[in-house]
């Protein structure tokens, strides 16, 4: 078991933010405080394998809150955006707790691998004090990395990742229609909608040639070999006719995005 208290400096994007008068209004923000409690046990299965189970609790205080949106910064950031570049206050709270199972096998009988499963909750408070799910509150997280060593320096390996349904902030379509192309997020609906499960399997094959003076390695890899869709929030555009002309009165429609691409790649290295 272990216990620790940690402090984190506010992000530079928040400390460097200026209001319209050119004043650094976030420079007095407090350090984010987090208290961690971890307990568990592990058990060796033979000479090469180990099983471990851990429970954890993390308590956060003095967490930054967006003054404009009234929510914790932990409830933002699911998209590609700069966090903290706004006025914030540091009186938010949060908590994360869960249980993790881990199985690990070192190279034995030509096989090696690590499998882990984590079940957890994560929530943070905003200006109202109400706890809302963080953007990474997927509840279920599974990962596997393993491989099998064949003869003559061939190796096949795989990586599997599964992520449960993740909360996201939907758009306010009425306000977004008036401000398009700037889409307006509706933070009052945070937690009401979730993305689909994320599930991806990657496969890789390696071959290595060893000589006295040098070694040569080659690999071929396929990402998302099962062609699973990557879950993303809905995207919208202006409705158009068959000629591409915007239809009046203007309205928004959901844009279909290709999200299940299989990505092959290869590479090599030469060492001497």
Name each model feature, range by range.
Residues 26-30, 50-112, 252-267:
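Outer membrane beta-barrel strand-and-loop segments of large Gram-negative receptors
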Residues 47-51, 110-113, 153-156, 212-216:
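Repeated loop/turn-to-beta-strand initiation elements of outer-membrane beta-barrel proteins
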Residues 57-59, 80-170:
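Gram-negative outer-membrane beta-barrel transporters
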Residues 1-5, 41, 53-57, 115-119, ...:
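Transmembrane beta-barrel strands of outer-membrane/channel proteins
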Residues 3, 124, 141-210:
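C-terminal beta-barrel architecture of Gram-negative outer-membrane proteins
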Residues 61, 113, 162-181, 196-200, ...:
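C-terminal beta-signal and adjacent terminal beta-strands/loops
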Residues 2-37, 57-82, 159-182, 230-233:
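Surface-exposed extracellular loop regions of Gram-negative outer-membrane beta-barrel proteins
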Residues 33-37, 93-97, 134-142, 197-201, ...:
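Residues that define the transmembrane beta-barrel architecture of outer-membrane proteins
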């Amino acid at each position: 078991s272990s216990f620790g208290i940690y402090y984190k400096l506010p992000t530079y994007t928040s400390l460097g933010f200026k209001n319209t008068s050119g004043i650094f209004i976030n420079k007095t923000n407090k350090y984010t405080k987090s208290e961690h409690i971890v307990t568990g046990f592990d058990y060796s299965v033979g000479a090469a394998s180990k099983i471990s189970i851990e429970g954890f609790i993390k308590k956060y205080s003095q967490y930054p809150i967006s003054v404009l949106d009234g929510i914790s910064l932990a409830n933002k950031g699911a998209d590609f955006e700069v966090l903290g570049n706004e006025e914030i206050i540091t009186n938010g709270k949060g908590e994360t707790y869960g249980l993790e199972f881990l199985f690990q096998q070192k190279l034995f009988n030509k096989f090696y691998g690590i499998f882990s499963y984590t079940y957890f909750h994560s929530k943070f408070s905003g200006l109202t004090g109400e706890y809302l799910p963080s953007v990474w509150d997927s509840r279920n997280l599974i990962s596997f990395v393993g491989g099998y060593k064949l003869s003559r320096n061939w190796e096949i390996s795989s990586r599997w990742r599964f992520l449960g349904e993740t909360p996201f902030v939907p758009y306010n379509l009425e306000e977004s229609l008036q401000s398009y192309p700037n889409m307006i997020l509706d933070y009052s609906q945070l937690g009401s909608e979730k993305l689909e499960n994320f599930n991806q399997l990657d496969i890789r094959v390696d071959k290595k040639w060893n000589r006295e003076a040098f070694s040569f390695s080659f690999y071929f890899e396929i990402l998302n070999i099962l062609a699973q869709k990557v879950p993303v929030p809905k995207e919208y555009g202006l409705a158009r006719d068959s000629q591409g002309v915007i239809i009046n009165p203007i309205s928004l429609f959901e844009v279909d995005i290709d999200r299940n691409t299989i990505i092959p790649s290869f590479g090599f290295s030469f060492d001497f």
